[in-house]
Amino acid sequence: MNELILGIISFLTSTVAGVVGIGGGMMLIAIMPSFIPLNALIPVHGLTQMSSNFSRAVFGYKDVQFEVIPKFLLGSFIGIGIFAAILNFISLQYVPLFIGTYILLSLWSEKFNEKIKRYESYFLAGFFQTGLSMVVGATGPLTMTLLLKDYQNKDKVVATGAALMSITHILKVFVFMY
């Protein structure tokens, strides 16, 4: 029964992300600890969000701004390597603390959000978004401010954001596989 409920929640949060363009992953990772063990939280979240974002990127492929992907990808590879090494030293019992702190700061701290906006490079955005996703799971807001600044068209922002999040989640899933 938990699997059915989690599937419905995943569908609903993915729908929110599809309509609004962001937020579904953060909602999902806040709910998931009620249904799955902590050691599976980040990898399962990565798999669900990988499929959600990848399908959104495929459906909106004509709006994806491919010129940002190489810089983001390079930063992502470096970030995932460094943060994967750090992950070996973090106890799983702290993962909910990191996730909760990140969500609260993202939603309620103007100062935190201002600091995030300083990373005005797709390389740095890839580094931090993909690296931090190993620990907190839902890091989509890190690139959305940059995309919103560079592209005023909502379809371009949503499709490109989905492509970048697909990269993040694919790399995260590969790291957790090994």
Where are these regions (language model features)?
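General structural feature for long, well-ordered alpha-helical segments within catalytic domains
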Residues: L4, L28, Y94-G100, E120-F123, ...
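Membrane helix-loop-helix hairpins that form the core translocation module of multi-pass transporters
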Residues: N39-E110
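Membrane-embedded helical hairpins/re-entrant loop segments and their flanking transmembrane helices
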Residues: Y102-A159
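Hydrophobic alpha-helical transmembrane segments in multi-pass integral membrane proteins
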Residues: A85-N88, L92-P96, M134-P141, K172-F176
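Small-residue-rich segments of transmembrane alpha-helices in multi-pass membrane proteins
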Residues: A30, S34-N39, L73-I82, S106, ...
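Small-residue-enriched transmembrane helix starts and helix-helix packing motifs
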Residues: M1-V16, K117-G131
